[in-house]
Amino acid sequence: MKDTPRLKVVVAICVLLLVALPGLAQDLRRIVPEETDEILANPHMGWQTFHRTKDQDQNLPPWIPSTVHYARWGWGQLEPAPGQLATDFLDRVLEETKRAGQTLAFRVMCCSSTPKQPYHPAWLKEVGGKIRNTRYGTGPELEVPDLDDPLVLNRHLDFIRRLGERYDGHPVLDHIDLGSVGWWGEWHMSQSSDVPMPSLETRRRIVDAYLSAFRKTPVLMLIGGEQMLTYSVARGAGWRADCLGDMGGFSPRWNHMRFYYVQALAKAKAVDTWRQAPVAWETCWDMRKWVSEGWSLRYIFNYALALHGSYINNKSAPLPEGPEVEAELRRFLRRLGYRFVLRELLHRSAVFAGGEMTITSVWQNVGSAPCYRPYRLAYKLQGPGGQLVLPSTADIRTWMPGSVDIFHPKFLEDPPELPPGKPVRIVDKLQIPSHLAPGEYTLAVGIVRAEDNVPVIRLAIKGQAEDGWYPISSVRIAGASK
């Protein structure tokens, strides 16, 4: 066991009093685990590394855990020849990510603003695809694919379909950042001299292709997609924003934090999207810019939590120095994503083999988002009869965090701290097999994968054992009642 649990155990002696089983002395045990303030390394949430795994990220301090590796690649890199996915490349990245204890999220890009480094495949022009010339601002001439051209569009839609056939539901694939359209796949062609955004119908077909190809893996739409944000979230997508922290870096009279994000969500009817699908943040510039400009970290982080973010991507840039920065980051990362606290657990101290064991537990999500994966709460008995795992009927995806009113007039002036979610009471009636050998059993709790009962989520309590379970009590199994 990594840490001997310091549990406040209240044993109320209720022998033959509280509906005790005939012939079996029982106490009602109430366990109150000790909460931890540790930053937890949990799947599908938290700090993202950028184009490198956490093992390769020299700017990742040891006190920040990371379970997600984020990257973006050009269409041409992922389909170097017509009809040929770069599976060797993607499989290698997935394997490196898995070895680092992370999952992978990525975006596909078609339009590059870097001269002589296009994102579209070199073969696209050779097969008759229409390529257009433009400039990014006052820069040199660039080639970008015309997604409104039927040949280009059909080739790209087929690429997305095959990408999903190969990788949808891959255990190491965390989510897809729905890209393809606009500069860098960011759904805009700002400062393009000659090439506008593709037609609305083309954009819709690209969104449909991603949502059809990736039905098991979550898909996130960039918040700047405007009409396509509305369209995507109505069909199950989450959303992503790539300029968290902009408090005036582009204009003294306008910024993303006060004048765009909340308003865009309202317009797209996406305010409650977080309840069913994830929200991802990427920093505008990186956090060093925020500190150098004197922008409030507390404001930015409270805002990100209030909009129920699950991820933060600082592009693997160096962090700003100073103990006050670390303190704010620690406070933020303790809350980012889901965070489950077991507040109390009640059970009787003894039960007959072949009988029913009732466990009542109270849980609270003190994070900023739900867990979107179908992991399940389970209990483990370990004793003379070996190991027995008993699943709960609870759906942990319904354990919601607290909320604040983001439309309150004062929210954009000073976002308040996100409150914890409401406590959730779970009552499980577990059937004990009649053949289970009598004796004293350790009772452990965990949140596990349904297919193999392996614990996957760290709880915000102390006392996790080496196997990932949390042994918190004991129960005596008596021989089967005659």
Per-region residue spans from a language model:
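Bacterial N-terminal signal peptides that target proteins for export
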Residues: 2-11
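Bacterial N-terminal signal peptides
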Residues: 10-20
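Sec/Tat signal peptide C-region and signal peptidase I cleavage site
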Residues: 21-25
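Non-catalytic accessory regions flanking glycosidase/transglycosidase catalytic cores in CAZymes
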Residues: 26-70, 75-99, 103, 152, ...
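N-terminal substrate-binding region of glycoside hydrolase catalytic domains
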Residues: 27-151, 270-324
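An active-site-proximal structural segment forming one wall of the substrate-binding cleft
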Residues: 93-98, 130-177, 202-209
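Substrate-binding cleft/loops of secretory-pathway carbohydrate-active enzymes
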Residues: 182-208, 213, 220-270
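Extracellular/luminal regions of secreted and cell-surface proteins that mediate adhesion/ECM remodeling
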Residues: 333-482
